[in-house]
Amino acid sequence: MIAVSFKCRCQILRRLTKDESPYTKSASQTKPPDGALAVRRQSIPEEFKGSTVVELMKKEGTTLGLTVSGGIDKDGKPRVSNLRQGGIAARSDQLDVGDYIKAVNGINLAKFRHDEIISLLKNVGERVVLEVEYELPPVSVQGSSVIFRTVEVTLHKEGNTFGFVIRGGAHDDRNKSRPVVITCVRPGGPADREGTIKPGDRLLSVDGIRLLGTTHAEAMSILKQCGQEAALLIEYDVSVMDSVATASGPLLVEVAKTPGASLGVALTTSMCCNKQVIVIDKIKSASIADRCGALHVGDHILSIDGTSMEYCTLAEATQFLANTTDQVKLEILPHHQTRLALKGPDHVKIQRSDRQLTWDSWASNHSSLHTNHHYNTYHPDHCRVPALTFPKAPPPNSPPALVSSSFSPTSMSAYSLSSLNMGTLPRSLYSTSPRGTMMRRRLKKKDFKSSLSLASSTVGLAGQVVHTETTEVVLTADPVTGFGIQLQGSVFATETLSSPPLISYIEADSPAERCGVLQIGDRVMAINGIPTEDSTFEEASQLLRDSSITSKVTLEIEFDVAESVIPSSGTFHVKLPKKHNVELGITISSPSSRKPGDPLVISDIKKGSVAHRTGTLELGDKLLAIDNIRLDNCSMEDAVQILQQCEDLVKLKIRKDEDNSDEQESSGAIIYTVELKRYGGPLGITISGTEEPFDPIIISSLTKGGLAERTGAIHIGDRILAINSSSLKGKPLSEAIHLLQMAGETVTLKIKKQTDAQSASSPKKFPISSHLSDLGDVEEDSSPAQKPGKLSDMYPSTVPSVDSAVDSWDGSAIDTSYGTQGTSFQASGYNFNTYDWRSPKQRGSLSPVTKPRSQTYPDVGLSYEDWDRSTASGFAGAADSAETEQEENFWSQALEDLETCGQSGILRELEEKADRRVSLRNMTLLATIMSGSTMSLNHEAPTPRSQLGRQASFQERSSSRPHYSQTTRSNTLPSDVGRKSVTLRKMKQEIKEIMSPTPVELHKVTLYKDSDMEDFGFSVADGLLEKGVYVKNIRPAGPGDLGGLKPYDRLLQVNHVRTRDFDCCLVVPLIAESGNKLDLVISRNPLASQKSIDQQSLPGDWSEQNSAFFQQPSHGGNLETREPTNTL
């Protein structure tokens, strides 16, 4: 049994009779009240003696409310034996029972008799100055049985005090130096009513002004000069109960408290073994439950004062706890006993304290214990890469998550000061900025917005080599705890700061702690965009207080990242402290191509998190083990369960990724940087890649005579590592495209050149014909329709051309093409294809196996085909290739012109003058991102997809330029072929489905509601095999039909809201709220429509019905739909 007693009893003072002297020690007052310091009959030893001066003001005819005993005739020095409740002396919060009065208004009392002392105090006047000696408080030592924790308490002054007495402080004699200790809490005062502060607690700071190194008089002055409301940082003791940590069954905990006082425990319910259990949900910081050290979050409450909780509701259990008397007996099952080993037995029986419990697979239900905290959650990614993330607090209705263990204040990070808990820091050691002078900091002001500080490495605390980085954090205030941070500045609040204020305190379970980025010692560079440097600490604190009105603040933080040890290659271990409710900051992914024995990959590291500050982890590093449990053959679920078992420290075994390793230099790889100035024109490069986070981004072709080719430093097959200093590590192709779009006039590319042996097999060395002859199959038909559209509507920062006098330009700003399969080679751990990268003019592209539609819209004189020329892929005979060679040259040149021009003047003119029909038909901007597969067909059986290729090019289409349009175009098989031709077509179609890329068009469409039908003329449905919302039916001649929508179009955005992961229940309200105008971004698979038409119709003209309604899904199955449908 563990009994912890915290008693705070109030002595009831009887009323003094009129003939009783207010300063005389009466018979009833010979015994000091309980809880007071023992009154010594002898002098205090010199080494434990402290002194202070107390000034009291009283009115004429009133008394101080002070009882004095002792005198030269009363066996002892004059001392305070009692303070009357509500008296002047008690309310001053400067005197305590047991203090020795050395002098009164400068008159030494050493030789005064008791009656003379009483007479002096009665007749001293209105101002009374007492010289007081007191016994110094004992020194608190943190050891195996006691640990220190901190808590921030906000108090309101009553008069000019907060209701507690402080002693200690710095002293000339080091042996007498003490922390500023609270020795007494006045009953009924502000501190007592708030309930957190207890005698023996240490006062560390007041409104951010730290008291370390201040004398007792200075500490008293700071308390008097602060405002009516002050934030006090308190350090308190927490008992370490070894018996709890080593217990093997239920425990009986007895806690003594004052009747009516709160234990500081919040309860909740959880389901365990299909039974409801009562567990501890929260423990208030510095409460009785927190200080005793026997109770922890997650403990099961089995009984309260002998009443079993087995069949009690949460409300009943809470009431039982509130009705407890001065002795609370709790039967608990410590939370650490509920953790099962990864391969542990299904049933574990624990018996103690006459109670038997049976547990099975408790981990699956443990998640419901803390629904408002951070957990390790399993989260499949949209691109089929399962990811293990450490997100923010899940909503109450979130799926079951996993509990994370609390962070022990004794656990310390070996990497950075910022990861230390305040309670673990010696009180003589506080963090400071690594750059000591104001001048050096001013030179860095312009760098505050950069993600990485340009300052060189410096020496931080404990001799560590660190570098500083900055990040921006947005906090939303909690109604109870606020933001949960306290700043620390100079000694004087009005002094101009020479360095930014520090975060000196972070409240447990506050927004500041839950964000996982802020740590004690971080420098606050700006608050809501206002720099803190060269302002006063009071101004910085006021900014923070003002933000609490709006419940939101944006902080710019500078923090240290360790550089003492940075592994360059090989395998190493990293230990991360795991705080309760705080994310580690790493995302672990399992690539879709992962095989048994392959490790998991670190795919993201949150900036400013514990993992980031170690300085040793990088994107792409392989995670081999967690707490010595290997992950080679572990699924993501296993990894989640292993992390669940982790205690205060998480030990990760890491293998450095090849691209992060220095060993690549010895393999012949060359890394360099190329800067390109586009001057309004295109770069002339084509990039290829996939949506897998760690697949390489490759330069697949260069425009002949283009900017990139003229540099001579960029070649086909080179890998792009970074764009404008933004690393592409762990980023898919879409992000690389976005970075290039936003790059501006100057584009800096970090290039990795392959080895000489590898570059010998460059795509340029192998003509296309030789590869096609190896395949021994039909040739591909060349078609300019393969050219994808420009993403100018998605990335509006496309640089327009400034050289309108030039007749034509080579290539586009970012022009990517797709090639055929060929011999692959290995470089840096990635498979590349030697034939994947060719110029658009060299490659064979695929055209629709259909007859043309030449239905012309009379109002603009454009054919249907010209307005919506698809990027569909298909196979055609070899004869068609010769027929369209000249045509391809024309279209290639025309589309290149459009690509180079950016948003041309003609387009801008149309945008200004376009009516509704022009907007619907002519102003649609196409953005095509093509996805395909790469396979090796070297006379072997077909293998499954080994790499998901994704390529992109940017093109802006406008059919308003007449010399680019073409009214008729035929790239179809002969319509009069016999059964053999039909069989051959089916065979080619099957080959196409296996080998050809899967094009996906992105369209931006603006629809206007039909005034007669009051709808947009289309219905939507949820995807069957793939998450998403798709167009199901389209009303002929309705807005959707006129706008170019087709069945199986997937809605990616509705009125600029991303709907990729939405279902119909979320999308339909968005469309309903759009009013008369609807902006859509949709993706389309042309092969779906191609296959549908091919199966429905014999060769011949298309019917309007066939062009509007498709009955079959694509071969990938991703466009199948299911009920319910909703007509909009």
From Swiss-Prot:
Modified-residue entries (Phosphoserine), positions: 43
Source superkingdom: Eukaryota
Region spans: Disordered: 754-798, 935-981, 1093-1128
Gene Ontology MF terms: beta-catenin binding; signaling receptor complex adaptor activity
InterPro entries to which the protein is assigned, alphabetical: GRIP1/2, PDZ, PDZ_6, PDZ_sf
Residues making up the signal peptide according to the UniProt record: none
CDD domains cross-referenced by the UniProt entry: PDZ1_GRIP1-2-like, PDZ2_GRIP1-2-like, PDZ3_GRIP1-2-like, PDZ4_GRIP1-2-like, PDZ5_GRIP1-2-like, PDZ6_GRIP1-2-like, PDZ7_GRIP1-2-like
Cell compartments where the protein resides: Cytoplasmic vesicle; Perikaryon; Cell projection, Dendrite; Cytoplasm
Cysteine disulfide partners in this protein: none
Gene Ontology terms: biological process: intracellular signal transduction; neurotransmitter receptor transport, endosome to postsynaptic membrane; positive regulation of neuron projection arborization
Record carries keyword Cytoplasm: yes
Statement: the UniProt record of this protein carries the keyword Membrane: yes
Membrane topology value: Peripheral membrane protein
A single GO cellular-component term on record: cytoplasmic vesicle
Compositionally biased tracts (Polar residues): 944-974, 1093-1115
Assembly, per entry: Interacts with EPHA7, EPHB2, KIF5A, KIF5B, KIF5C, GRIA2, GRIA3, GRIPAP1/GRASP1, PPFIA1, PPFIA4, FRAS1, PLCD4, PTPRF and liprins-alpha. Can form homomultimers or heteromultimers with GRIP2. Forms a ternary complex with GRIA2 and CSPG4. Interacts with ATAD1 in an ATP-dependent manner. ATAD1-catalyzed ATP hydrolysis disrupts binding to ATAD1 and to GRIA2 and leads to AMPAR complex disassembly. Interacts with EFNB1, EFNB3 and the C-terminal tail of PRLHR. Interacts with SLC30A9. Interacts with BUD23.
Disorder named in the UniProt entry: Fraser syndrome 3: A form of Fraser syndrome, an autosomal recessive disorder characterized by cryptophthalmos, cutaneous syndactyly, and urogenital abnormalities including renal agenesis or hypoplasia. Additional features include abnormalities of the larynx, ear malformations, and facial abnormalities.
Function: May play a role as a localized scaffold for the assembly of a multiprotein signaling complex and as mediator of the trafficking of its binding partners at specific subcellular location in neurons. Through complex formation with NSG1, GRIA2 and STX12 controls the intracellular fate of AMPAR and the endosomal sorting of the GRIA2 subunit toward recycling and membrane targeting.
Entry domain remark: PDZ 6 mediates interaction with the PDZ recognition motif of EFNB1 and EPHB2 and with the C-terminus of PPFIA1 and PPFIA4. PDZ 4 and PDZ 5 mediate interaction with the C-terminus of GRIA2 and GRIA3. PDZ 4, PDZ 5 and PDZ 6 mediate homomultimers. PDZ 7 mediates interaction with PDZ domain of GRASP1. PDZ 7 domain binds CSPG4. PDZ 6 mediates interaction with the C-terminus of liprins-alpha. PDZ 1, PDZ 2 and PDZ 3 mediate interaction with the PDZ-binding motif of FRAS1. PDZ 4 and PDZ 5 mediate interaction with PRLHR.
Protein name, as recorded: Glutamate receptor-interacting protein 1
Organism classification: Eukaryota, Metazoa, Chordata, Craniata, Vertebrata
Gene name for this UniProt entry: GRIP1
